[in-house]
């Protein structure tokens, strides 16, 4: 799969077209998504919450198979993003690894232990936000979100 065609191969827009966001935000989201994939995160979803939330542009939602998997995934995302000069603004819920929220400003990562994600149904709570279903590809490009 070429990076130029990554969008067509990796995501499916299930609501209206994704609103336009700054390239830095799209790159940030792409880097977080790639880190989730590299950590074997499952059931990746991106919500474009800019018009319904106002404080962030994207929610990235990912699941792990255990609380330790969630913690490891979050560690990798934080370490990767910090190395790229984008440390998180805040982290909540890391201790138990059931629902960890990592705030990067324009992008917020919600990492869930699988059964807990079903209970909170964050996708249902933000149903008005355009949704991008990610097919968990081997690689993402910065264009993963932009070309939608």
Task: Please tell me what each predicted stretch does.
Residues 69-75, 79-86, 101:
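Compact, glycine-rich, soluble single-domain proteins
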Residues 61-63:
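Short hydrophobic/aromatic beta-strand micro-patches
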Residues 1-46, 50-51, 68, 72, ...:
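Long, contiguous binding/interaction regions
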Residues 44-55, 89-106:
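Glycine/charge-rich, flexible interdomain linkers and switch-proximal surface loops
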